[in-house]
Structure formats: C-alpha cells, structure tokens
Amino acid sequence: MGTLSVNQNKLQKRLRRLAGEAVADFNMIEEGDKVMVCLSGGKDSYTMLDVLMHLQKVAPIKFDIVAVNMDQKQPGFPEHVLPAYLKELGIEYHIVEKDTYSVVKELIPEGKTTCSLCSRLRRGTLYTFADEIGATKMALGHHRDDIVETFFLNMFFNGSLKAMPPKLRADDGRNVVIRPLAYCHEKDIQAYSDLKQFPIIPCNLCGSQENLQRQVVKDMLIDWERKTPGRTESIFRALQNVQPSQLADRNLFDFSNLRIDETAASRFVNVVNI
C-alpha cells in the first residue's frame, strides 16, 4: 500500500484512536500481558490485529501479541492464506485444527442456522488453547455495531437486556476476553479492510445462510440510521448509561426496601414554613 490520501489517513487515525480509547477505558491490556488475537480471516479480526500491532509500538506499556486461527475443517478452507499473511507480518502465530464442521453438520438440521453452535464450539476450543499457551487476554474482533445488534437480539429473542461487554471474564474464570474495536464503526472497518486489501476468507458454513436473526436486526438498524442519522450511536451511548432504578430488575435495584426519605420530607416542611 502506497502513501495514504488525506481521507485514508483520517480513517486509519480514527480506528487507531477509537481502539486506543476502548483499551484505556476498560483497562483491556496491562503491562506484561500476552494477548491472543483470534483471527477468523474476516475484515474485523484483520483490522483488530493491524490496530493492536500499531498500539504495541506506541503504547507506554509492554505486551506480547500472538495470532491464533482455528481451522474448523470446512470444505474449501484455504489453509495457506493466514500462515502466509502472518509469516509476512513476522509475528508469532498458531493454527489450531479441530473438526467442528462435521459436528455442526451432524447436529444441526439442514436449513437451520449453524452460527450459535459453531461459535460455542470455537469459543470452547480457543479458551482451552489460550490457557495452554499462557495467554492473559483473548482479543475478539467485535465492533460497535455487533454490540448494538446483540443488544437487540437478546431483547427481542431472549427477553434480556444484555449485549457484548468490551471486557469479560469467561465463566471458567481462566480467560479474560477483550474487544478492542468496541468503539469502532463497521463501515470504517470495511473501508479500512478494502484499503489494506486484507486476504479475506469467507465463511462457507454460515456466510450464505438467509434470514439469520442477526441480519434482520442489522437491516432494521441500517433502516433506522438512514431515517434518523445518529440513532445507532445514541443506542450505544445508552449501553454506557444504565440507570437500574428506572428499570424493573429486582436483582439490580432494591425496590422492596424503597421508602420515603423522612428527613427529606421534614426538610421540605421546614422550607415551606419559612
């Protein structure tokens, strides 16, 4: 890639700045961390690796990066692409081979979406591998739009108010997941991926499935954004401004013991009598 144009330079700086802010805001990376960057071969994970490698050069702390891809034995998966790319970058990398493709095809009926089971199997394998190599953080490439979409998916289909946190301790307690692109827009990531000409590997297992719930939600948000620009950004800000007393979750707020403040009542009476 040659010299960047003014707009391309702004795009690169914006992605680096937003990722840096997310890392700082949530204390994602600390001195001496070994960050396992999970690469799928898609635009998001390539961009994440690119941004983290820059951050590694300019950050005031020292941390290591190791790239990891999971070969799930999908038919037609180009096994040479990622090793060639990562060798050229000159960073440590591992290819974890596990045939989850056959498991998914066996358990999921034809025509049904495979994403949920596929991601669970992949996540479990990567958690185990992170522990094996001594990784202290596991970086995933989810961006701001993914987080907002997940919020609506959980609300519409699971009856819960939750999304994807920028930083998460896994249920096993052994892994901390970070999402450095949490503040980044998907459209910027797509533009940067096109600019850098990353060697994208399509997902043959689920990439062509129609009517996925996530795609329905994505289309809804795109339509909202078209009609009311800035709405998606406002929704993301709302996830950072939760007020438990204004919801109805008794586990988050103690409604049972909510009483009038007698001292406040007496102060009001005194003010009225003055």
From Swiss-Prot:
Asked whether the keyword Transport is assigned, the reply is no
- The organism's lineage? Bacteria, Pseudomonadati, Pseudomonadota, Gammaproteobacteria, Pseudomonadales
Q: What is the source species? A: Pseudomonas savastanoi pv. phaseolicola (strain 1448A / Race 6)
Q: Which reaction does it catalyse?
A: cytidine(32) in tRNA + S-sulfanyl-L-cysteinyl-[cysteine desulfurase] + AH2 + ATP = 2-thiocytidine(32) in tRNA + L-cysteinyl-[cysteine desulfurase] + A + AMP + diphosphate + H(+)
Cofactor, how bound (note)? Binds 1 [4Fe-4S] cluster per subunit. The cluster is chelated by three Cys residues, the fourth Fe has a free coordination site that may bind a sulfur atom transferred from the persulfide of IscS.
The UniProt annotation puts motif PP-loop motif at: 40-45
Is Disulfide bond tagged as a keyword? no
Q: Write the record's keywords in alphabetical order, separated by commas.
A: 4Fe-4S, ATP-binding, Cytoplasm, Iron, Iron-sulfur, Magnesium, Metal-binding, Nucleotide-binding, RNA-binding, Transferase, tRNA processing, tRNA-binding
Other known facts:
The thiolation reaction likely consists of two steps: a first activation step by ATP to form an adenylated intermediate of the target base of tRNA, and a second nucleophilic substitution step of the sulfur (S) atom supplied by the hydrosulfide attached to the Fe-S cluster.
Q: Which Pfam families match?
A: ATP_bind_3 (PF01171)
InterPro entries, sorted = Rossmann-like_a/b/a_fold, TilS/TtcA_N, tRNA_Cyd_32_2_STrfase, tRNA_thiolation_TtcA_Ctu1
Enzyme nomenclature, EC number? 2.8.1.-
Q: Which GO terms describe its molecular function?
A: 4 iron, 4 sulfur cluster binding; ATP binding; magnesium ion binding; sulfurtransferase activity; tRNA binding
Q: What is this protein called?
A: tRNA-cytidine(32) 2-sulfurtransferase
